[in-house]
């Protein structure tokens, strides 16, 4: 059975490249978040976590930061979902390169926008639920989401 074999050596390089792409997107997201913070609340850091919470929740600038930050974060999450929803399973399952894996993922999302949007919401809900108990729940949520992603990939790509 293909799912039980160890990672093929040719796939390791492609998986590494895909990971680096996602790492670059993460770095861009951090830069965007820092920029949004600076533009809305100013360049100075708060003196405490409670001061930060007060500034964010009780000022117009704080609510602007929340709204803009959530919108930008949603766009980053959407890009990550689109390029990676079937990329990693495809790289593990077949001998394809990163470009083809990303193109296949984009095509899968384009051809199945409703189910893929639902899957994105399920992933988000699973991660939130796993994070609530001091991140310990992620030890349960991540393997379940990974297994379900494999089945989604098999159903969508075949």
What do these predicted ranges mean?
Residues 1-158:
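Hydrophobic alpha-helical membrane segments
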């Amino acid at each position: 059975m293909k799912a039980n074999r160890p990672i093929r050596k040719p796939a390791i390089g492609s998986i590494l490249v895909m990971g680096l792409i996602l790492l670059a997107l993460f770095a861009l997201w951090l830069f965007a978040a820092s920029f949004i913070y600076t533009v809305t609340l100013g360049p100075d850091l708060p003196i405490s976590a409670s001061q930060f919470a007060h500034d964010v929740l009780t000022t117009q600038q704080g609510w602007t930061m929340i709204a803009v930050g959530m919108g930008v974060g949603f766009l980053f999450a959407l890009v990550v979902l689109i390029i990676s929803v079937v990329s990693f399973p495809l790289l593990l399952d077949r001998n394809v390169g990163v470009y083809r894996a990303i193109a296949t993922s984009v095509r899968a999302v384009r051809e199945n926008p409703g189910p893929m949007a639902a899957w994105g919401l399920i992933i988000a809900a699973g991660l939130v639920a796993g994070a609530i108990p001091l991140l310990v729940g992620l030890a349960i949520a991540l393997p379940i989401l990974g297994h379900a992603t494999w089945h989604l990939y098999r159903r969508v790509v075949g």
